[in-house]
Amino acid sequence: LIIDNNDLQFIEHSVQEKIRNDSIDIVFNIYEGKKDLVEKINITGNNVTNEDVIRGELIIDEGDPYINLQLEKSIAKIRARGIFKKVAYNVQDGSKNNLKIINIKVEEGATGEISAGAGIGTSGGTLVFALQENNWLGEGKVVAFEADIDEESFIGRLNYSNPNYNFLGNSINYFIENQSNDKPDLGYENSVL
């Protein structure tokens, strides 16, 4: 946290624990580490997902100081998107002593969902159908449709979500809902969009 808040670079640390009879001594050693830079970031395995979606989750970029903590946070953000089955990385030496090459390998996972349901009760039957795609056109966007139908009403919803709008970490969501009721026994019909 101190490193992130103060924008300190090339900082490394180690923790030493000394256990005694009735106490534990913990020593944090913080020191200036080797001044490595990121030469290149290679991304492989993304056959469906656009590379921009993955790079948009990276905290570390080419030309930045190589800080392992930032790399681990970046990998965690990629995994958190939920569109990859596996995310692995390795770091190798670059073209010079102080340069590092980061290789990120992803394995695409299933991103679509289909669900359906039916129910019968004393007031009639209901059908529900839903579709959702969590990586629409490989752009990391979420598109979902849901329909809820019974004897007297229809509810339809269309949702669109961009979880990393303009690569700023902000989410933007749109949805449209249509609800129609037809109750001939009560003498009215309405529709709401």
Give each language-model segment a name.
Residues 1-93, 112, 168:
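Acidic, glycine-rich low-complexity/disordered segments
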Residues 48, 67-193:
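Gram-negative/organellar outer-membrane beta-barrel architecture
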